[in-house]
């Protein structure tokens, strides 16, 4: 079975494309998923992309727990839970799955309360301010990370 990447999106990301487009852009979550599936294929690596979005902290935690032993890497945009959720941090630490934290906007150019992340110091990498392209960068990073550790055999060189 090919290695899998779990894409997790937190609160309000179901509104992507319509919620504050000047900050988050006009790409919908559905369109983004299509792009990311194509990105996985373009890497010439046999990867499976799984996705889950919830506005509920407990549902995200349950999905992280279910990933243990079943997922090789997580790409997460925790949304507002970035700044508030010790529980999400503990769930990610508890399953010991490497992850990248993604933010569409540059959180450091926004309100002060958005500058603090409960996840960043546990992440393999943090990507912010690249718009939805940040997700593509995270998927590429995850593929390379898995390849370097022998988790995935390349069909062709990256």
From Swiss-Prot:
Catalytic residues (positions): 24 (proton acceptor), 103 (proton donor)
EC number(s) recorded for this UniProt protein: 4.2.1.10
Assembly notes: Homododecamer. Adopts a ring-like structure, composed of an arrangement of two hexameric rings stacked on top of one another.
Function: Is involved in the catabolism of quinate. Allows the utilization of quinate as carbon source via the beta-ketoadipate pathway.
Domain of life: Eukaryota
Gene designation: qutE
Biological pathway: Aromatic compound metabolism; 3,4-dihydroxybenzoate biosynthesis; 3,4-dihydroxybenzoate from 3-dehydroquinate: step 1/2
Lineage summary: Eukaryota, Fungi, Dikarya, Ascomycota, Pezizomycotina
SUPFAM superfamilies, per database record: Type II 3-dehydroquinate dehydratase
Binding site for substrate: 77, 83, 90, 104-105, 114
Catalytic activity: 3-dehydroquinate = 3-dehydroshikimate + H2O
Residues annotated as site: Transition state stabilizer: 19
HAMAP family: AroQ (MF_00169)
Swiss-Prot/TrEMBL keywords: Lyase, Quinate metabolism
GO biological process: 3,4-dihydroxybenzoate biosynthetic process; quinate catabolic process
Matching InterPro entries: DHquinase_II, DHquinase_II_CS, DHquinase_II_sf
Stated family: Belongs to the type-II 3-dehydroquinase family.
Source organism (scientific name): Pyrenophora tritici-repentis (strain Pt-1C-BFP) (Wheat tan spot fungus)
Protein name according to UniProt: Catabolic 3-dehydroquinase
GO molecular function ontology, one term from the record: 3-dehydroquinate dehydratase activity
